[in-house]
Amino acid sequence: MKAMLVHRSKVQDEHGNTVEIKVWRVPATEHTPFGFKYSFVYIAGGERVIGYDNERGKGHHRHVGGEELPYAFKDIPTLTSDFLTEVAAFKRSTYG
C-alpha cells in the first residue's frame, strides 16, 4: 500500500501566516506503528515557527523556534488540537 493522502489543508490566517496540515495513511510498520504519516506547520514571516511531524528515523517530534523536541503522539485529533493550541499561544504572545 502506498501512502494515501487523507487530509490536506493550507490556509492563511488573519496575520498572513500559513497553517498547513497534511496527513497520510501508511502501512503500520516499526517506524509508523499508528499507520499515519503527518506534517503540521505554522509559517510566520516566511519561517517555520512551529512544526509537528513524524519523519522516518526521528519518530514523533515537534519544532518550536529552532528547537526539535519529542512529542507524545496519541491520535490525530489530539495531535491537531495540540498543534492548533500551540499556534494560538504563539499568536497571542506575538500579536497580542
Task: Locate the predicted segments by residue.
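Short helix/strand-capping connector loops at secondary-structure junctions
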Residues: 58-71
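The feature represents the first ordered module of a protein
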Residues: 1-61
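Short, compact, well-ordered microdomains
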Residues: 68-96
